[in-house]
Each structure stands twice: as structure tokens, then as C-alpha cells.
């Protein structure tokens, strides 16, 4: 029998056994409670990185632990396989995206299997599989029928490098989230999902997710951005219509002196007088190519242009010039802002720059503001002035009063708006899910009939690197008869945003072999919601919000019962090295393959779990990896060295244990308690592993000559191996087998700690006099209060502080301290 730890041999052996025996396959016919565990599935980029190793190791510990705790654990894996990198690789390498993607999947699957992850590989899916995206097309058609999918012309975020549209959430600091190119504004016909219809439910249900990090919930609430206010109509001079604004500050309406429109506002050009047209067009073009995030930044220079038109303040009847302003966006409110320069800093800076009127309508109590001497806008609450019948009223009270007045006079309506905008899903790329729509000159927009699904992504596509989608140049794909009238028609050539696929994959895992509909309601309702979801904080708004939206839509379409997809969410930290996130450009990447080849998967897993709590960044260091490997070698040697001792051990006689044996057993059961609590309640894997390391030290120095040394050591080593099983499953399985234990560890129950054994015989207690530490005493565990008081009062170190004073009170906190109050 191999005595030296050989991770390669051990890991290969057990990976083969797990695969052959389908050890982690599950179904719904179980009397165990279900537990659905999921890590965010990866994009098949070619190979896994250390972030994957950490993420999937975290999930695997939870899955193996829950399995040993008696749960029916669903732990699937798949591939978020559509997307631009495959298409770009096709252009660069002259390889079809499908070939590139599936080769990467095969390679990465092998890498994940080498990590010993407990996935039910029978449920594996790839979003580029026809059997997956066909059902997504059906869901699209059902959303279209319900008015949840629609097409409109709008300004969109355009990445000139990727040559495709980006959702607002995919623009980071004015750049494309994938390639970092500056994003431009472009007007296109686009397909949208009506996520705004679910804005209030998405917001209110954040209160029903106590298992989510507060940071993520705050980010989602802010992105949804609910605001209470008024929509107010400002009539155009000359009686030719009006400009509608949304404001959360109706109390400032008497101070509105000009109007600011977003350059993209639909009325911008029609309000421009002929003499202003050239200047306005130049301004619109300039702003269109400006980073949107810069436009709203506090330190960005406020610029604008006068349109030549005026509107009328409905309360003051003052004539207000209408400007286009670079800091106003169309995707908040109505895209028009009533400018109140004395009470809004951006308006103040703009008015000062262009010489526009300032009028104070809110004063701080006891102070008079003079517009001529103001150096900044006054934005705090105060007392109303220059506001007609509302003068003297508090500004907070005036918000409601003026809103009511506007509504009564027909000049405005109290309303609620959201920052959230509908989700633009059109992408001008090939490697994605075709949008199942046909355009007919006679019939208009015609959904592809369900009997004609799926719309297959054609394989005979040429990748030239030219702009736009290759599908738009493929006549055999484009030209089709209209399903309604039979006349020549054209297919939609846009594909869906890849975030659509990741918005429901967790549901399809529940029934990947179901061929009659997108989802099998019975099986989905058994498994959903996901009990524990694991992924990066960078998905807080994008993927997680879309997944919540899709779950609610599918609930309303009758496919699922649940309203929220993920009960608990863990956002793990990054893996960093030399103070920076690992990346090829920084030259600080650690190759998991090389790591596993040298040390084994168990060592890689152990270090990634031990070096930091899951939610914190992990700072990579080679010494830590060496330390983890040495620890596993010590475990291996200890168990193998003690096999003979424990093999012939008599059953454990607890009442007959010696004091030394009892101490050793106490260490074992305290460790079981500690590791159980750390994994189950807090996912503090680092402190759980540290506790096992401490136990190993105790076991290595244990006296083997005591009467029941073999029996105590047998229980201790069995517990040690079981506690390590979720972290280092290959070694644990091998040692378990060598110890002569029947069955696999995956079906072996987690050890239960003996409450009596885990309690210390003696405890160290602090003794204070008037709150100051004066001594420490060792007492028998479970001593009653009177005994503790007597021991404290009699202690030699305490006695000098009791001379010549009266003991007024003795406060006892069992197991911790005794405080003697004197005076």
C-alpha cells in the first residue's frame, strides 16, 4: 500500500470512481429535503483561472457538507456559451464560433473534473445548444404576445469595437464592459424587454431577500431608483403644445427660470428655431459622442445651447428660455428639467455661465438669501418665499401642497417614476440566439409560428471582420416567406443579448432533458428556488436583476411557482497577487493546471479556502500553497501511521476514559462543533480549516500508551477525515477506505459532536474588583454561583484589594468573570 502521499494517483482514482458511479446524480424521488446549490456558470473562454478554482471550491464544500448532512443536493454545471469572444476568435483564428466554443467546453470540463467537483454532469447544458435556445425563442414569443417584448427606435449605447449595442448596465465608466472601448450614442431600431412593468415588484421584493448581502440589495434598489414627484406641463409660448417635466421638488417650481432638455429629447429639433439650427445640430453631435457617465458627473463642465423657443411657468406665468443641456439625460424622468438655479447646483452653474435669471424661493430660517451674492445653490429645506400663497410654509410641507394645487388646476399630476429603463436585448452579432421575428411589407412584424421553431443559427456563415452581423449578409437566412400571407419577407438578423440566456439557465437545470416545453413545472417547483447562489459582486445589477425579472415573468406565464430565483447569495472576493487582480496583462496569473500538476487538486482547493473568508479578496502567495501541501502530507502520514493501532481497537468505553483520554476526546468534539458551526452558519471555511489543523497537532502529540488509546484515536481519526471531506475530498475518500470504512464519504453522515464531551472540565475565569482585572482563577465547569463567588473572594491576588473596604455586591457571569463591587 502506498505510504507516501501521491495526489495524482489518489485524485485520478477517485475521480474515475465518482464518474463511473454517477456519485452526484440526483432526482426528485428522494425522502431527503432538497438543497439546490449553484455557482454562476462560466463563459467557455478556453481554460479556468484561479477565480474559478476558488468560486467552485466554495460551492463544492457547501454541496458535500449538505450531502453529508442529509440533503438531496442538486449541484449542476453548464456553459454561458454565446457571446462576442467566440465570434472575434473566429475572425482572428479562421475557426467557426461553434467549433471554438465546443472545443473550449471540452477542455474546461476536463479541468473542472480534475478539481474533483461534485457536479451532476448529467444535467450539463450549454446555452448555444439548439435544445436550449429553441425554448428561449418560445419564451420570447410568449413575452411578445403579452406585450413584454417590443420594438422601438431609440438612442442606444453603441460599442464601435464590438460593433453592437450595450445595455445601460453593460456600460462601465463610459466604456464597454467587455472591451473597454468608449461607448457612443446611436439611434437604432431595437427589441426591448419591458422590465419596467416589474419595477415595483423588483423593488419591494428586495425586502424578502434576507439571505442576500445588503450591499447587493442597495445596488439594485439604487438602479431601480424609485422617485415620488410630479409631472408638470409647461405650455409653449404661442399655445402650440407643452414640455412635460418630472420633478421631485414641486416646492421649487416658483423658482424655475429656464428649461433644460436632453439633446436626445424628441422635441429638441422641433423646438429649435431656424436661426439656431446649425448651432443646435453641432451641439447635439458633440454630446452624442460624449461619455454618458461624464455628462452627469459633478465636476463635468455644464454646457448648453439656446433653442430659440420659450415655455411658460404654469404657476408664475414667467417666460422661460428652453436650452439643450449636456447634463440632462433622456433615461431619467421625461428628459426635460425645470431649471431652478438657486436650489440646484447644476442649474446654478449653468445659469451663471449663460447669464440666466436666479430667483430664491426657499430661505434658511432666520436668513435672507440674495441671488446676486450667492456662490452656490441652497439645496436644504427651509421656509417658502416668493411663492404666492405658499409663502411662510415649510418647504417639505409645500411639496405636497403645491403638488395638490397643480393637480387641482390641471397643470400637473402626482406620479412615481423609476430610474430603471426597459432592457434593450438586440445585438448585431452572429453568435447568439436569433430573435424569432419576420418582417413583411404587408403584415408588419410577424412572430415566427411556434411550429416553425427553432430558428436555427446557420452554420454556413463567413466571418470577414466587417462591421455588423454576418447574418445581415446571409441571404439564405434572411429571405423567407411571410408566415401570415406567404409573400416574400425578411428575418430579423439581430440576436439576443447573452444576458437573456443567463436569466433562466438555473431553471432549465431542473429539467434539462424535458422536450415538451421550456420547463417541466413539477420538477422545477420541486427544486426552486436556488437555496445558495455563488458569484461575483460585479453581477449585482446586471445578471442578478435580469434573473429576478425573468423568474417573475416565467411565474406569470405559468412555468414556475416561485417569485425569486435565489434564496441566499454569496458574493465571493477576487483572487489577487502582488496587490492586483490576476490578469495576463499584469503578468501575475497563476495557472491552475500547473498548480494541480505539482500539488494536486486537494491542495489547490485547500489553499483557496483557507487563505481568506469567501467574501474577502484572496491574496495569493506561494508559501501558503506549500503550507497547505505540507499539512495534507502530515494528515496522510498520521492516519497511515495509526492504521495498525486503530484496526484492532475495542469499542470506546466513555465512562472508563482516563483524564488524558478524556482531554483528547474533548479536543475532537470541540473541533467537530467548531467546524460544523463555521461551515453551516457562516461559511467561515478558513477558521474551520484552522480548527482541523489545531486538532492535527493535538493528535500527533497524543500519548498512545493509555488503556483506550486505540479506541480514542480511532474516533479521532474518523472525525478528522470526515471533517476534511468537503475540503479535500480525494484524500479523505482514500483515507476513509484505508481505515476499512464501508461506503463512500458522499453518503456517510457528518459527525455529530457529543455535547458533554465538548464541554471543558475546567474553565478559566476573570476576577475583577470594581471592573478592573485583579486575577484569573481556574474553576470546575458547571460550578454554581455561590461557589464561584467564594473562590473569587478567597483568591490571594484579590484579597489585598478587599482590605478596609466593604463588599457591596458580587456580580457573576458564569464561565466568564466575577466582578466584586466594593466601596
Curated annotation (Swiss-Prot):
Its EC number is 6.1.1.4. A motif ('HIGH' region) lies at residues 42-52. It is an enzyme of class 6 (ligase). GO terms for cellular component: cytosol. A motif ('KMSKS' region) lies at residues 581-585. Pfam families: Anticodon_1 (PF08264), tRNA-synt_1 (PF00133), tRNA-synt_1_2 (PF13603), tRNA-synt_1g (PF09334). It comes from the Bacteria. GO terms for molecular function: aminoacyl-tRNA deacylase activity; ATP binding; leucine-tRNA ligase activity. ATP binds at residue 584. It catalyses: tRNA(Leu) + L-leucine + ATP = L-leucyl-tRNA(Leu) + AMP + diphosphate. It is found in: Cytoplasm. Its main location: cytoplasm. Keywords: Aminoacyl-tRNA synthetase, ATP-binding, Cytoplasm, Ligase, Nucleotide-binding, Protein biosynthesis. GO terms for biological process: leucyl-tRNA aminoacylation. Belongs to the class-I aminoacyl-tRNA synthetase family. This is Leucine--tRNA ligase.
